[in-house]
Amino acid sequence: LAFFDVVGKPIAVRSSSLLEDSHYQPFAGIYSTYMISSLDDKNEMLRLLLDAIKAVYASVFYADSKAYMTATSNVIDQEKMAIILQEVVGTQYNDRYYPSFAGVGRSINYYPINDEKAEDGVVDLAIGLGKYIVDGGRSLRFSPRHPNKVLQTSTLDLALRDTQTRFYALDMNRGEKPFSIDDGFNLLKLSVRDAEKDNSLRLMVSTYDPVDQMIRDGYYDGGRKVVTFANILQHKAFPLASILDSMLTIGSREMGRPVEIEFAGNLVGSGNTPGTVYWLQIRPIVDMKEMLSDEVMDLPDERTILKSNTALGHGVMDNVSHIVYVKSSSFKSSNNVNIAREIEKINRTFTEREENYILVGPGRWGSSDSSLGIPVKWPHISS
C-alpha cells in the first residue's frame, strides 16, 4: 500500500523473463502486460495488482506463448520470470490517461529507403499507449537520423491514408470492473478527435486544409488533424529524434549488439521543461548477415516463382516446401477474421507434419484492425 502512495499514478504490470531477454533468440509481446488504474481505494487497487501478477505468470501457458515457444524450439521448463511494476507514463484527461507519445525503436533497420543505412535505425511512433503499435496500428515510421524524411507524409494522399487515426488510453473509471485475462480489458480505443478535445495534440499534429488541398504543419482551428509529428521531427520543437538516436546508440554499445527499445513521453512539461522521454525497456536483436547482405542470388527465370525489384529486406530460408496464398479477391474486412481462422487450421496441419510454408496475401499481416489486414496471431502462423 505504501508503494501506491509513493507512485500515485497508474501502474504497469509486466514480465521480465530469461527467454524474453535472451541474446540468441529474444522475443517480446508474447506475455501479457496489464495496467492498473490509480484508485482511492488502495485495497481494491491491491486486489487488482495481485490479479494482474497472477495473470502475467499464467500467460506463459496461453496458446500464443506455447505456439511461439514451439516455433523457436524453446520449452516452458527453461523459462524463469520476474514481475516488474512500472509507473505508467502519461497525463490524466478527465476519465482517461495516456502519454503524449509512445514508440518502439530499433538500432538496425532491415528496410532502409533512399540514402538511409541499416545502422541508422528506425522508430515507430504513435500518440497514446504503445499497445497501438504492438497491435499493428498505423504508427509513424522514420529513421531518427533522417527525421525530415518520412515516407508516410511525403504526399497528401499518403498522409491522409496512412497516418494514425486511433489511439489507446487507460480507462480511469473501471477500477471495479471484473478482472479479465484480456490484458486490454480496461483500455479505451479512441479516435484522434477525442485527443483533440483533451487539448493534447498541439505538437503532434498538422492540419489538413481541404480548400487549398494541402497539409499545414501545426495545429489550427478547423480541418482534419493529421498525426505527422512535424513540429517535433522537422521543426524540432522537442529534440525527440536526437534523444532516440542517442538511446539506440548507447544501448547498442553497452549490449554489444543491435537493440530494440520501448519508450514513452509527455510533452506537458512544467516551468522550463518542454517534456520528458522515458526509457521503458531494452532487449537485444538477433541480426543475421543474410538479412543485411545486398547480394541477391541470380536465379534463372525457370527456377523463380516470384520476383520483385521493389521488395524490402533480405533473408535466406532453405527449409520451405509450401506456399499458402490468400487471393486478393477474398480480402474483405468482414471476412478477414474468418480467413485468420482458416489459416490457423492450415498452420496446425503443417505444424503436425513439421513442415514450413510461405504465407502470401494482401494487406498488413497481424493487424488488429481487420480493415488493414488479416488479424493473425502467433498460433495462426507459427510454422
Label every model-predicted segment.
Residues 1-383:
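Conserved mixed alpha/beta core segments that line enzyme active sites in large multi-domain catalysts
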